[in-house]
């Protein structure tokens, strides 16, 4: 069983500054019974990678064509003469149509709201994804419901659509040693709800003087700044 995973363009498959998708894929690959048959493809400038089963797609800068389209085209070229059983795409539904020339099963993973993404915003686009993918995986029932909005009932029964909840390693927790601490971990942008968290946490900390909050993460593309004496923003860890 040979599996190729195409990361979102510019996603860093590196322990130095990984994206959420890279962290998820690295964790799953280490546990997979097919881990020796999996190859991850991406495009990053960072030298240190999570694993050796990674191929970096090198691109030349061009103002005349889409870097994303060029990225996917290079991936297709690498697979034209390969016998790959499954191609995995994460959070980039618009990549699927560019892969139709490859006679390979395609699995699409949604880690966020499908109707907010290029390639799955309209009912027509989502119907095409169902037609072209062997399986579409959601990380929650909510994201699956979002995907099915305005689609005929027949699509709601499709066996191609499946929910697989993300998980973490189970740790022993001593309930008696609870702290009055609220934590936010993730990208500090509105897509992840940090704008709502920030406004809410300021109200909570003002009302409950003995509570504290810790924020772990960053977001260079969107600046959402919240300040409070009991709020610590630690940045990317």
Task: Label each region the model flagged.
Residues 4-6, 137, 174-192, 196-202, ...:
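Conserved donor-binding/catalytic core segment of Leloir-type glycosyltransferases
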Residues 6-15, 24-67, 157-160, 219-221:
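N-terminal strand-loop element at the rim of the active site
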Residues 70, 112-132, 170:
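Nucleotide-sugar donor phosphate/pyrophosphate-binding loop at the beta->alpha transition
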Residues 89-95, 110:
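Short His-centered aromatic/hydrophobic patch
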Residues 114, 142-143, 160-172, 220:
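Short beta-strand->alpha-helix junction loop in the catalytic core
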Residues 119, 131-160, 170:
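A short, active-site helix/loop in glycosyltransferases that binds the activated sugar's phosphate group
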Residues 198, 211-225:
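Glycosyltransferase donor-sugar binding loop
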Residues 222-237:
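Nucleotide-activated donor-binding/catalytic signature segment of Leloir-type glycosyltransferases, i.e.
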């Amino acid at each position: 069983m040979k599996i190729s995973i195409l990361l979102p363009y510019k996603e860093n498959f590196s322990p130095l500054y990984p994206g959420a998708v890279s962290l998820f894929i690295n964790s799953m690959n280490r546990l997979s019974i097919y881990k020796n048959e999996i190859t991850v493809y991406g495009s990053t400038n960072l030298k240190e990678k999570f694993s050796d089963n990674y191929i970096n797609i090198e691109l030349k800068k061009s103002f005349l064509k889409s870097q994303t389209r060029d990225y996917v085209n290079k991936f297709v070229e690498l697979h034209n003469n390969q016998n790959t059983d499954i191609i995995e795409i994460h959070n980039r539904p618009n990549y699927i149509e560019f892969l139709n020339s490859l006679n390979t099963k395609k699995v699409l993973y949604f880690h966020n709201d499908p109707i907010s993404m290029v390639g799955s915003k309209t009912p027509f686009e989502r119907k095409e994804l169902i037609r072209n993918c062997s399986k579409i995986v959601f990380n929650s029932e909510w994201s699956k419901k979002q995907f099915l909005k305005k689609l005929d009932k027949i699509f709601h029964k499709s066996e191609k659509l499946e929910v697989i909840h993300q998980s973490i390693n189970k740790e022993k927790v001593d309930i008696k040693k609870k702290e009055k601490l609220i934590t936010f971990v993730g990208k500090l942008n509105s897509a992840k709800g940090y704008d709502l968290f920030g406004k809410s946490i300021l109200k909570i900390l003002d009302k409950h003087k003995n509570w504290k909050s810790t924020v772990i993460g960053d977001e260079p593309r969107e600046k959402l700044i919240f300040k409070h004496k009991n709020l610590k923003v630690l940045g990317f860890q």
